[in-house]
Amino acid sequence: MSLKAISAKDAASLDKDLMEMGGWSLDQLMELAGLSVSQAGMWSIYRLHPPSAGKNVLVVCGPGNNGGDGLVAARHLAQYGYTPSVYYPKEGKNELYQRLKTQLHNLSVPFVPDFTEALKSADFLVDAIFGFSFGGPLREPFPSIISQIESSSVPVLSVDAPSSWDIQSGPPKEGPGSKFMPKALISLTAPKPCVKYYRGRHFVGGRFLTKSIVEKYGLNCPDYPGIDQIVEVGVDAEGRL
């Protein structure tokens, strides 16, 4: 099944429609997104890498909603039996993010101050730094962080787009992120155009869209198995979903 990719502008408009006309709150959308991220992490690592084989998941969060999705995912991963830690160098100012932090503190999920040291002990990494609204350029500390992720052998799950990638044109031609190819990618709601440059395990999470939203944006949602919130869709050698 071929899936339609949506632009950053349409993705932002879709989120606005969900909240203004659909009755959804930002909290709800972030919870569903974070749940999808955690399930993609489970699919990517649990069947081949259960908690008994290595529990340490490093969740790297940016200052926006993509980072909030990462905070939610970290909570779910803790409940699944993993040992997540969070690197959150530039915290978002929205009060929602502070509540998510409190939830993690109550589960004794640590917020680590040193990314380089945390990466050394990570078995898996969730890249929740930048999402569909990223427009560049990268600002510190993120160029250094992305360079370290890029050169590490730790498997990575990126949220909505590999951080540093342009949503339309994919990886930068040079500098941090130019060779960044995470092991897995979870597209939230619908794939973004940059996915045609991606090679790896590709998941979609958006099992909450109404018929009216699907029709308005011309989406063709995949069939989700059972009660799963995500589905693996892949990308072929020609960049087609």
From Swiss-Prot:
**Which positions form S-S bridges?**
none
Q: How is the cofactor bound?
A: Binds 1 potassium ion per subunit.
Q: Which residues form a coiled coil?
A: none
Sites where the protein binds K(+): N66, D127, S163
Q: Does the keyword Membrane apply?
A: no
Q: Which UniProt keywords apply?
A: Cytoplasm, Isomerase, Metal-binding, Mitochondrion, NAD, NADP, Nucleotide-binding, Potassium
Q: Which residues bind (6S)-NADPHX?
A: N65, N66, G67, G68, D69, G131, F132, S133, F134, G135, G136, P137, D160
Names of required cofactors: K(+)
Q: Which PROSITE patterns does the UniProt entry name for this protein?
A: YJEF_N
Residues covered by the YjeF N-terminal domain: 11-221
Per UniProt, subcellular location reads as: Cytoplasm; Mitochondrion
Which InterPro entries does the protein's record reference?
YjeF_N_dom (IPR004443), YjeF_N_dom_sf (IPR036652), YJEFN_prot_NAXE-like (IPR032976)
Query: Pfam families, from UniProt?
Result: YjeF_N
Please write the reaction equations for the catalytic activity of this protein. Answer: (6R)-NADHX = (6S)-NADHX; (6R)-NADPHX = (6S)-NADPHX
Keyword Isomerase part of the UniProt annotation: yes
- Kindly state one GO CC term assigned in the UniProt record: mitochondrion
Molecular function as annotated in GO = metal ion binding; NAD(P)HX epimerase activity; nucleotide binding
- According to the UniProt record, what class of enzyme is this? isomerase
EC number(s)? 5.1.99.6
Which NCBIfam families does UniProt cross-reference here? yjeF_nterm (TIGR00197)
Give the protein family: Belongs to the NnrE/AIBP family.
Write out the function statement from the record: Catalyzes the epimerization of the S- and R-forms of NAD(P)HX, a damaged form of NAD(P)H that is a result of enzymatic or heat-dependent hydration. This is a prerequisite for the S-specific NAD(P)H-hydrate dehydratase to allow the repair of both epimers of NAD(P)HX.
Protein name in UniProt: NAD(P)H-hydrate epimerase
The source organism is Aspergillus fumigatus (strain ATCC MYA-4609 / CBS 101355 / FGSC A1100 / Af293) (Neosartorya fumigata)
